[in-house]
């Protein structure tokens, strides 16, 4: 691990529409605002932050593969891929990088098909229903874990 920890933030499909799409579920902040706030927080915590949002499953998988031996922790909001992607699960398990799963909305208070996650049983933790604050809590938790190891 480098002297400065590196954390990768991954955001899945339709999160590029934050601020426009169903604000009652996802809030009014757009993704750029969320990432900017996280970047400020990461700087204050003395960690490097990388970010990728993609609507394409393979791009998220490639980012996970490229994180191997380069990234210390992943924070992922897989969005709709949460409920469908064995491939994302396998990629995360393959690189053996600890990760936290984040969801803006409380997926358990929504449609039944959103209740299952292919990732949560392998995640260090899951944060859902706290809006954009969930990312900030995940970043703090990731840094705390990295510093305690």
Swiss-Prot record:
<dbReference type="GO" id="GO:0019631">
    <property type="term" value="P:quinate catabolic process"/>
</dbReference>
<comment type="pathway">
    <text>Metabolic intermediate biosynthesis; chorismate biosynthesis; chorismate from D-erythrose 4-phosphate and phosphoenolpyruvate: step 3/7.</text>
</comment>
<keyword id="KW-0028">Amino-acid biosynthesis</keyword>
<dbReference type="InterPro" id="IPR036441">
    <property type="entry name" value="DHquinase_II_sf"/>
</dbReference>
<feature type="binding site">
    <location>
        <begin position="104"/>
        <end position="105"/>
    </location>
    <ligand>
        <name>substrate</name>
    </ligand>
</feature>
<feature type="binding site">
    <location>
        <position position="77"/>
    </location>
    <ligand>
        <name>substrate</name>
    </ligand>
</feature>
<protein>
    <recommendedName>
        <fullName>3-dehydroquinate dehydratase</fullName>
        <ecNumber>4.2.1.10</ecNumber>
    </recommendedName>
</protein>
<comment type="function">
    <text>Catalyzes a trans-dehydration via an enolate intermediate.</text>
</comment>
<dbReference type="GO" id="GO:0008652">
    <property type="term" value="P:amino acid biosynthetic process"/>
</dbReference>
<feature type="site" description="Transition state stabilizer">
    <location>
        <position position="21"/>
    </location>
</feature>
<feature type="binding site">
    <location>
        <position position="114"/>
    </location>
    <ligand>
        <name>substrate</name>
    </ligand>
</feature>
<dbReference type="GO" id="GO:0009073">
    <property type="term" value="P:aromatic amino acid family biosynthetic process"/>
</dbReference>
<dbReference type="InterPro" id="IPR018509">
    <property type="entry name" value="DHquinase_II_CS"/>
</dbReference>
<feature type="binding site">
    <location>
        <position position="83"/>
    </location>
    <ligand>
        <name>substrate</name>
    </ligand>
</feature>
<dbReference type="GO" id="GO:0003855">
    <property type="term" value="F:3-dehydroquinate dehydratase activity"/>
</dbReference>
<feature type="active site" description="Proton donor">
    <location>
        <position position="103"/>
    </location>
</feature>
<keyword id="KW-0456">Lyase</keyword>
<comment type="subunit">
    <text>Homododecamer.</text>
</comment>
<feature type="active site" description="Proton acceptor">
    <location>
        <position position="26"/>
    </location>
</feature>
<comment type="similarity">
    <text>Belongs to the type-II 3-dehydroquinase family.</text>
</comment>
<dbReference type="GO" id="GO:0009423">
    <property type="term" value="P:chorismate biosynthetic process"/>
</dbReference>
<feature type="binding site">
    <location>
        <position position="90"/>
    </location>
    <ligand>
        <name>substrate</name>
    </ligand>
</feature>
<dbReference type="Pfam" id="PF01220">
    <property type="entry name" value="DHquinase_II"/>
</dbReference>
<keyword id="KW-0057">Aromatic amino acid biosynthesis</keyword>
<dbReference type="InterPro" id="IPR001874">
    <property type="entry name" value="DHquinase_II"/>
</dbReference>
């Amino acid at each position: 691990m480098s002297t400065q920890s590196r954390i990768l933030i991954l955001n899945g499909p339709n999160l590029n529409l934050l601020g426009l799409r169903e604000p009652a579920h996802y809030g009014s902040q757009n993704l750029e605002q969320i990432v900017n706030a996280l970047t400020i927080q990461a700087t204050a915590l003395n960690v490097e932050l990388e970010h990728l949002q993609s609507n394409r499953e393979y791009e998220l998988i490639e980012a996970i593969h490229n994180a191997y031996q380069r990234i210390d922790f992943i924070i992922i909001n897989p969005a709709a891929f949460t409920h469908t992607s064995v491939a994302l699960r396998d990629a995360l398990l393959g690189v053996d990088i600890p990760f936290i799963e984040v969801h803006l909305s409380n997926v358990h208070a929504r449609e039944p098909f959103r209740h299952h996650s292919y990732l949560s049983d392998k995640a260090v933790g899951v944060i859902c229903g706290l809006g954009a604050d969930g990312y900030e809590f995940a970043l703090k938790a990731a840094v705390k874990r990295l510093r305690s190891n």
